[in-house]
Amino acid sequence: RLQAECGFDLSALYVHHSLQAEADDWLVFCESYCASLNVPFRFEYVQVARSGKGLEAAARQARYQAYERSGAEVIALAHHQNDQSETFMLAALRGGGLRALAAMPQWRTFGENQQIWRPLLTVSRDELQRYADEQGLSYIEDPSNADNSLLRNWLRNEALPLWRDRVPQLDQQLSAGIQLLQQQLAVLDEVAEADAAWLEEAGYFDCGRWRTLSPAKQKQQLYHLARRKHLGVPSAVSVADFQRVLQHISPGTQAEWQLPAGKIYAYQNRLFALREDWLADCFWLNPQKMTGEDACLKETVATGSIKLCWHKLGLREDVLEQKPVIRAVTTDDIIELTAGHKKVRKLLQECKIPPFARPHWPVIVDVNNRCIAVANIWVSPSHACLGGWLPVFEQFNLFILEPK
């Protein structure tokens, strides 16, 4: 009914975690129920990789990755007021900060262009139960909710009922407090955004400017950067450790901050935030992704992520028709300069490319394994012409701090 009234397409996604024997039955139930409502339905199996996380956190991560892959503009979730109370209490028991204590917002940006919507946060579980019973709706009880060895379940089944006996309006009071926290958090986020815009005014995270901030704002900006770049939530200890490193690091030294979903590197007074999959498009690092041996450079580039860009001194057309190889630089690679030759690793160092990026830098070598071009930077004069073509991997441009 709402689809016709509001003009949107509704579909349902069941995420199968393969954690419970009943999961297949739940899939059948959801599929049948959606069919009765003429709502398109699909399901997705996910692997729950704990990798240091608790079971609940690992399952949540796998589930949200499935939501992101769905391509839906808005993902509607059924968290209710009691869930909100549990989330707040969990955050408090785990020593969470303001963002954790602010629990679940009704709306939040998710992924690149998606929104998470929780329309039932002001509705209690009892109200939902009464509605389902009155309307004769079928529903499923998850048996794992009875497992009080999980902290959330213990709160739900043991602790919070006692609090509700003492404070009958507990959930409403917590909800009101959470809304105030969310308002205060929104103001802090506005301040953080303004500071971030100033720090990155030159197009990169300026550590020199960052050092002029108060210690509290310095930490806030590190949290903010990790969140903006979708690198996961760092612990307070790791933020404090990296803050100390940045206070004293020399420009030519590289520092690394390991995060749940990637890394942040410091080099030459800049920060570089990288997801775990930042090398995914570097086809030259994976021989299986390379074009066949008979392909010329033009064909290899056409099927990969490297582009040919016009350059004042670039590769000649006849070189593009040959069959050179694109691969990662090695310690033995040497490139011809206008006068003499130079080790490619030295050239990368002179361009102030961060050490973490240098081993992955693409070079083009001829059939004799001689380097004829360094992507984004230089072309051997004996293979070049005025107004030729420079192989460019655009993702790596941000690493060239001192262009040739």
Identify the role of each PLM range.
Residues 1-161, 190:
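Core alpha/beta nucleotide-donor-binding catalytic domains of modification enzymes
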Residues 3, 15, 46-48, 62, ...:
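AMP-forming adenylation/ATP pyrophosphatase catalytic core
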Residues 9, 40, 138, 169, ...:
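Short coil/loop linkers at secondary-structure junctions
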